[in-house]
Amino acid sequence: MDSVSLYAHMKLGIVHFKAFPEVEFSQSPTVMLDTLKKIAEDDFFTAVEIGPSRDVRIRHQVRQLLEVSHLTVCYATQPTILGGKLNPNALDPAERRRAVNALKNCVDEAYDVGASWVRLLSGKDPGDSKRDEAKKVFKDTLREVLDYAKQEGQMRFTLKIFDRSIDKCSLIGPFADAAEIARELCPEYGFGS
């Protein structure tokens, strides 16, 4: 029987800030770069999901490292959204605006590090009575962020889904809701494709 390489069928990746949780909480700007070097040196991985870095110089060094390592890069917005207690589907316009601005900053950071993908997520589920309204607001948020990203170049986006009723209590928890959003946004933005 011929052996088949997994690499022929998928990119094997690692979530950087989960493998190295100190990245999220460290005050040292070099922690991100130092820990990414460990991943880049491990030829098992062909992709890495990274989160935010406040230091633009570190982001540019990260980009250089990831380019020479030939790793596919996905930028995760969940540390920003969850850590900042932001809500992209907030019914309050000021609260939603804070989330939109943060997501636009995430897009800028994703371009800085050379990411091919950005992973977006919804905020808290407001409950049955306001869920449809919150979904509409979330789609508006996504359109605004995707339009913003188009100005900078080509970036692909995916939707990170969490649970609706156990821990994260996210608006977009069930897969069917994520698929509905992807179907609606895919023709114009290639979202989720």
Predicted regions and their residues:
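Charged helix-capping and loop-helix junction motifs
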Residues: T30, A134-D140, I172-A178
